[in-house]
């Protein structure tokens, strides 16, 4: 179709939709009630289908941690599939110490009003009411996160009580299965947030898939033993073994700071990546955001990843933290069961 023909077609399409809108308004004035085109239960908010389906739409994408509208707009312009609003970036949480809590609701709402991509926010492990508040203001995804200070070390939120999908972190398969059994619609690796060091995320993803591969070759009795060991439903263990992966979308997170880091995690089996401090604690956030988005989407194309890596400079990257220098009590990944 020529350019002129395409424009003519778009004009006709516009006139058609305007005509439909006028017809709708006239019928409304006459008191016409619109019939439901599909059963309500098929699209009801909060169903497993809806809560698991939303994260599936984010595959091969990047969700970026942000603390304000300006950062959120940079993320959107770079091609991020979503933003995660925090009070402080994980690197700053680690440096500041003290109690890390949910971001200000006003800041979250301000971000929601300025970007068109999905907006998520973190809550403290076990803090039901932070989660209820985020659901009330209409966030798209809630992260029950070890980056914030837990209010309950022994019990996570029962996510079946909410209509908004949740994401939780894990270090290995048992942890992931417990979170899914609690209602998590999405899983991510914990890694070690705020370090700019991807080594822990790599370790967690390898542990996750090593266990899944072992289950895939296991007999039924072994699956029963594993379910008891993990304190997870046998049906969930069996489904994971049959699929050869977790039955929910699984993102990588924790220390991703370069396009190569993102591509590595995708190669290890991630469906997408969360990037925390790696972008906005660098000296080239806009270019780095674009480069990580490109490397994540095109991770299986070496030429594209080379192009992405050339977009950033190692000299501009955030100053990383060697995991070995952290004391046990400084590790964020150990929070939660």
Swiss-Prot record:
Location of the active site: 122 (schiff-base intermediate with d-ribose 5-phosphate)
Keyword Plastid carried by entry: no
Pathway: Cofactor biosynthesis; pyridoxal 5'-phosphate biosynthesis
Top-tier EC class: lyase
InterPro entries (alphabetical): Aldolase_TIM, PdxS/SNZ, PdxS/SNZ_N, RibuloseP-bd_barrel
Binding site for D-glyceraldehyde 3-phosphate: 206
Recorded catalytic activity of this chain's protein: aldehydo-D-ribose 5-phosphate + D-glyceraldehyde 3-phosphate + L-glutamine = pyridoxal 5'-phosphate + L-glutamate + phosphate + 3 H2O + H(+)
Family as reported in the entry's similarity comment: Belongs to the PdxS/SNZ family.
Protein name: Pyridoxal 5'-phosphate synthase subunit PdxS
């Amino acid at each position: 179709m020529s350019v002129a023909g395409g424009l003519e077609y778009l004009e006709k399409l516009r006139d058609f939709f305007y005509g439909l809108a006028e017809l709708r308004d006239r019928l409304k004035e006459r008191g016409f009630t619109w019939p439901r085109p599909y059963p309500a239960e098929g699209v009801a908010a909060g169903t497993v289908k809806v809560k698991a389906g939303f994260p599936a739409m984010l595959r091969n994408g990047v969700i970026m941690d942000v603390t304000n509208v300006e950062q959120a707009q940079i993320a959107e312009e770079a091609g991020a599939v979503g933003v995660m609003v925090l009070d402080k970036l994980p690197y700053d949480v680690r440096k500041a110490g003290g109690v890390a809590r949910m971001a200000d609701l006003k800041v979250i709402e301000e971000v929601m009003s300025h970007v068109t991509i999905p907006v998520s926010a973190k809550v403290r492990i076990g803090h039901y009411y932070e989660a209820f508040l985020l659901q009330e203001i209409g966030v798209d995804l809630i992260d029950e996160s070890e980056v914030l200070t837990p209010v309950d070390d022994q019990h996570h939120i029962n996510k079946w009580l909410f209509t908004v999908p949740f994401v939780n972190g894990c270090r290995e398969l048992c942890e992931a299965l417990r979170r899914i059994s609690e209602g998590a619609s999405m899983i991510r690796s914990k890694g070690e947030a705020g370090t700019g060091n991807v080594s822990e995320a790599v370790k967690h993803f390898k542990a996750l898939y090593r266990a899944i591969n072992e289950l895939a070759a296991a007999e039924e009795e072994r699956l029963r033993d594993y379910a008891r060991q993990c304190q997870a439903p046998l049906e969930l263990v069996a489904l994971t073994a049959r699929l050869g992966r977790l039955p929910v979308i699984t993102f990588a997170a924790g220390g991703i700071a370069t396009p190569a880091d993102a591509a590595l995690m995708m190669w290890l089996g991630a469906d997408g990546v969360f990037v925390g401090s790696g972008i906005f604690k660098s000296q080239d956030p806009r270019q780095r955001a674009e480069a990580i988005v490109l490397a994540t989407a095109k991770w299986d194309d070496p030429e594209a990843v080379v192009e992405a890596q050339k977009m950033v400079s190692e000299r501009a990257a955030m100053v990383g933290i060697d995991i070995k220098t952290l004391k046990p009590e400084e590790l964020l990944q150990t929070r939660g069961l």
